[in-house]
Amino acid sequence: MLRNFTLLIFVIFLSHCTNGNISNNCDVGSENYINSLLLRFVVKDRSYLCGYKVRIPACSLSYEETHLPENWIQVKQEVETQFALGSSGEETLIKYNTNTVAAVTGAASTAFQGALIAPNGNVYLLPYNSPKIVTINPITKNYESAATVPGNVDFIGGTLGPNGIIYLSPHTNNTFFKLDTSNNTLTNITSISMGGAAYNGGVYAPNGKIYYVPSGESTIRYYDTKKGTIGSVATPVSGGIFANGVLTPEGKIYFIPHTATNIHILDTFTESVTTIPFSFGGASNYISGIYTPNGRIYIIPYNASTVYYVDTKDNDKVVNAGTIPSAGTAMFNGVVLAPNGRLYPIPLNYANFISIDSNNSEIRVLMANPSTNSYRGGVIGQAGEIYLSPHSSNRFDLLDTKSIGSFCDSVRLSPYWNKF
């Protein structure tokens, strides 16, 4: 903020030092043009200047602006710039806190599902059976209890909305809650009578709405952060449970099928729902998805052996991206994009960690998974490390991806990737 204010004063000073000739306002070499350009950058004025539109660099945007379609070019450029820096070595698994999960939460097992980064810099581990929402300070690696919850799978996942507020996705609970991460206050939004296992995670869309991913419910519900109201999309989903939602720069949410067989697509600008004809087979075959800057949505297996991606730049063509080595059941739950350009599916019962190259889809087998039913979800840290959300694993772990680059705060917090 101080930097922008200083720059603004400098621009004003320059404008008063010019000779007042406005005939060359559109001459790119003129002082008037440069001053106007700098001023527009400081105040984030995106209107056209002499036929050109100012694009604010991704790292100068707020995270609430990164998922607006008009800003995708800058976000893509920033992410790909970090990708190009590559890795410094082989990944390592690190136990970053000596306390056990059971000691911290009081929950014997299946503590968390999902994690988010908040604007205060902390990692928020979202509850499954844990009676607490736990925060991790990435600098000190210390933990705190942010809020108390019933801890009976009331929620599965959550979404970071505007102003640092996390919206928890109701699963067995009929109440919609939000957590203000500025003061860790948990607030009841409203209650609605719903069936069991209602929703799995959510997505913060460019229209300001939090869309909840249907699980037991077929109705796509949303919370409008601008109006403070709960609403629903007219067209329901069908065919079974969806495990995850993926946002694209076109403002579309792709619901990843779990027991359902087809991907359903919600256009958040029209709130119309369409499907991709390709069958993923249901049977809990798939569990997660993630968007990559080349326009792909990688679909992460749960019980299936094949990894697919949806090419959103080629009419949503579904492409076979490879096979999981020694595939089993209940393999992964969640996936994280790292600054080295690799995807890291989060192992649940799979024997190892793996990585998938987002450019050529190469699958690499990494270190052993130290437990079973281990983790569900994770989130990227400031140095490219992934904080794992412990499910039955009784320890606090991070995966050091050895990324040379890093994502700035606005990208790390972006609704494209900071979700479950």
For the regions a language model picked out, list residue spans one by one:
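Short loop/turn segments that connect beta-strands within beta-propeller blades
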Residues: 96-99, 137-141, 180-184, 224-228, ...
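A short loop-to-beta-strand structural motif that recurs across blades of beta-propeller domains
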Residues: 92-94, 131-134, 174-177, 218-221, ...
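Short loop/turn segments immediately following the C-termini of beta-strands
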Residues: 87-88, 128, 171, 215, ...
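Conserved beta-propeller blade signature
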Residues: 82-85, 123-125, 166-168, 210-212, ...
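Surface loop/turn motifs at the tips and blade-to-blade linkers of beta-strand repeat domains
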Residues: 65-67, 104-108, 147-151, 190-194, ...
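Bacterial Sec-dependent N-terminal signal peptides
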Residues: 14-60
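Blade-level signature of beta-propeller repeat domains, shared across WD40, Kelch, NHL, RCC1
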Residues: 376-420
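Repeated scaffold domains used in trafficking and secretory/extracellular systems
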Residues: 69-77, 109-116, 152-159, 196-203, ...
